[in-house]
């Protein structure tokens, strides 16, 4: 309707104010149908005062939300927590809200236009800042719970919950980082979500939030520990992306400040991630020294979680690259047992990867394939891009060893398509790259260059689910 007067570009720029743009409709229609604002306003007028109040307050949610979140964030000052369910049900009956099922349970959602109308009313009440703080506090609490429960049998539930809550977690992060006194909360929230950035395929987004968080100056007493955690998590993400220079800078700052403030946990994490950096840059003796020291520090302070187990897996990888396969197997079997005792599935997948590497190195491709299939299934369930692509890379080598060079080349094409969403392929590491080069050389020899390239291109065209199923 507006294209007679405006270009598509002008329409796009004006869509931020949908109520101003979408006005002046069919003059033969009822007055309440002629503009978007009066159409929504008609529904608003039909609501009771408590319904209008809840509508306005629910506008602070940036995506789907559950009942518990609505009760916490929106109650008080004229709306008791025990009344939220009844008022919310009335808004559902009037289609102000919609109800949806998700892997994280029953959720509620507002259409963006309905939400924008409520947000205008919330601003008019003068209560918007308080509601945004309550929204922030709820999601900081949710992230705290999810980080603790990641190391438990509820790992799948946690992954689904954070995925469903991501729009609201982003909104909470924005609020923390925009508020003058919210820097320490932003650093805390960005760091607490490490398992999602690293374990659920969100490396680039995690890097975005963490870099913003560590640039902010927080109150020393309130934010020191949160800043240290944000620094080592930022370094972890950058290492996995193959970006070693900013990773090293963050780790050096973290270690220096952790020692100054006598924070043994932050020292251990900084040392652990420095060992991980040495591993992916092929300095294996230094990696082994640092990782053993970090694991000793973890034991001294009683730390046991998925990060600690990953440190042991990384130590096993360093031992395997140096030729000590029995020690690598011992370390990863221990991790596997701890994971089974605690219901941990994510770190277990990386232990299976190292065990598969050892099985292939010892000439047992059948055992290696069995372990890698298990590893890949778990990584795919969590959407862990790094775990998935490492498993596919090694599966390609196992496949060529079993005599199917064409399928091995297809799998290399699959891996080639996956690496850009992670970072630098195989971290730029000669040791991690060795299986890829062995596979490529064997496949090219058996297929010829032209057929090899054709198979790689076929693999690169496969979607993620199709590739994993294959």
Regions found by a protein language model. Give the residues of each.
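Alpha-solenoid helical repeat scaffolds
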Residues: 89, 170, 174-177, 211, ...
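C-terminal non-catalytic interaction modules
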Residues: 406-470
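Acidic, Ser/Thr-rich low-complexity linear motifs
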Residues: 146-161, 382-385, 420-438
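Tandem amphipathic alpha-helical repeat scaffolds
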Residues: 187-201, 226-244, 265-283, 294, ...
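Aliphatic-rich helical/repeat scaffold segments used for oligomerization and domain docking
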Residues: 1-215, 386, 392-394, 398-410, ...
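Eukaryotic all-alpha helical interaction scaffolds
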Residues: 176, 197, 217-218, 238, ...
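Short coil/turn linkers that connect adjacent helices within long alpha-helical scaffolds
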Residues: 179-181, 219-222, 256-264, 296-304, ...
